[in-house]
Curated annotation (Swiss-Prot):
The lineage of its organism: Bacteria, Bacillati, Actinomycetota, Actinomycetes, Micrococcales. It is found in: Cytoplasm. The record marks N12 as: Discriminates between blocked and unblocked aminoacyl-tRNA. This is Peptidyl-tRNA hydrolase. Its EC number is 3.1.1.29. Keywords: Cytoplasm, Hydrolase, RNA-binding, tRNA-binding.
Amino acid sequence: METLWLVVGLGNPGPGYAATRHNVGQLVLDELASRDRLSFKTHKTNATVAEGRIVPGGPRFVLAKPNTYMNGSGGPVSQLLRFYSLEPSRLIVVQDELDIPFDTLRLKFGGGHGGHNGVRDVIAEVGSGDFTRVRVGVGRPPGVQAAADHVLKGFSAAERKNLPILVADAADAVERIAAEGLTAAQNRFHTAG
């Protein structure tokens, strides 16, 4: 039986959030979908999904964006796992990460939520933290700006220049995890920072 991966990009719904740091996971899914001209469609699990192969002959993917706010992401993720009869080990969550500098990726399997409320809800609803995370660094806010304000704002002009490369690297990391395993992806994409 061929391998199927569920890849979830965390974020908030609506155009007002589309270009914010909190939605970088969904930007990565848009990049993945564009590589094989996959289209997102509404799914009964309260998510929009695109299904297919990103690389011809490569693993099959279900790319999913929950249609909930970040803190309610777990319900759609849990429903998608059940719908596709997948174990959490076949789940890759792409998320923003404050504790990692901008322009940096960190990949890991398992663990806690690290203070990320979207991941916290996924763990609670799935009943396990045993899934892969692609953590895309958005950095801490400057000065005394609240973290919540920072992630809900757009990227700076300097960040926007490098954002396409960061998003493409995160998409490449997802592909490598599915095709070659987490260790191979970590060896390639763990950057200094």
